[in-house]
Amino acid sequence: MNFHRYFNVDRPPVETCVVGTGDFGRSFLTQGLRVPRMRARVAVDRDAQIAAAALKASGADPERIRICTTAAEAGKAFAAGDFVAADDLALVVGLPVEVVIEATGHPEAGARHARLAIEAGRHLAVVSKELDSVAGPGIAHMAAARGLVSTPVDGDQPSLLIGLVTWAETLGFEIIAAGKSSEYDFVFDRATGLVTSNGRTEPVPALADHWELGGRAAAEIVASRAEAVAALPQRAVPDLCELLIVGNATGFAADRPDLHAPIARITEVPTLLAGKAEGGLLSGERRLDVFHCLRAPDEPSFAGGVFVIVRCTDRPTWDMLAAKGHVVSRDGATAMLYLPRHLLGLEAATSVLEAALLGVSSGAVAPRPHLDLVARATQDLPAGSTLAMGGHHHTIDGTTAELVPAVALSPEAAAPFYLAANCRLVRTVECGRLITVGDIEIAPDSELLALRRYQDAAFFGATAAGKVAENA
């Protein structure tokens, strides 16, 4: 694809507003100074000083950064060509920006920002996977009803993987699985017997016995590696959350609620994430999964990249491609096609430009709620306690995440993970049980709840939504 031709629209650059100036927002602002067809002059964070600092760090002229506390101040600064920093989207959403990038990572705040952007007639780029996992299809439906676009963003794995899946489908490939590498690699130094992952180093000399796949059964070596590194985390909520977004865009499903998540070397992935009939782990096709990249210190990472596993229907062609270095399974039946990157805000502009210039999303044409991310208690959770969301990965202590088929909210239904986050339990949840909507106290004015009810009404029918409104 020639991107210059794709975005060849004769008009002024697209003006944007980014809400949330953490890693993604900051990288978006930095690249925004360099994208010819886009401007990134407006930043919002919980403290305007944080937004201003992010603008300065991005390379904006400090003399042109204005901290604005009213809509009038913001309007004056924007008209003068200055950079605008604010502590509330409501102060700046009336500026002549075309796309709001929601990158806070906070589901309740993100729901409010989504509503404000759509009500103001702005396209929405949803970076916050926590928000998307609860009500992404509903937000897209709401935006489309107003002639607007809600889109995931290139730079994050969901949009990149949706692009790779649809590329493969366009070319007629038979897709067995799609996924991404996990948040962190497992880097094994065979000389010392040490494994490093996510800043932790553990002695695991036994892993040397499981370094090579060879002719071993997929399930056996995956189990052996998992046992060897049992001291290190092997599941991360963000992985499941991101794959949910892909599932809602493509209809792909998880093979098991917590994913297989094998620890695998890059060359092994098409062997392990193949059907059981082909010696792999999967019970069907069009499955979503993740792998933990096992590598030596001097080997390249998969870098949180995305992949599809496809069937090799023409063996001579794939034998030729394998000889050229493409990653083909040990029996030659499947191959992995992949993008070993996700550049966060540095490559998000393509999604922003698609929304503003072309009126299309980088995700599904019309996403549907196929999956829900839910929480299962890993310990007894007493009534009256709060399901506090915290940490870099926005986890909830005492729970683990799972992917299940999406349903409308009801007291008996499992509560979406990030709808339950920061809610108080009204009754004890025993270890091993899914947390249900009836277990939690949701603030009646929750904007996230309102968006989810809208989604349920749009996709599961007014009767289901009415039941939720009465009982949730």
Language-model-detected regions and their locations in the chain:
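Short gly/pro/ser/thr-enriched loop/turn and capping motifs at secondary-structure boundaries
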Residues: Q49-I50, L131-G136, A140, Q157-L161, ...
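Rossmann-fold NAD(P)-binding glycine/threonine-rich loop
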Residues: T104-A120, S128-D156, T166-W167
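Rossmann-like NAD(P)H-binding beta-loop-alpha module
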Residues: A143-G147, P152-E227
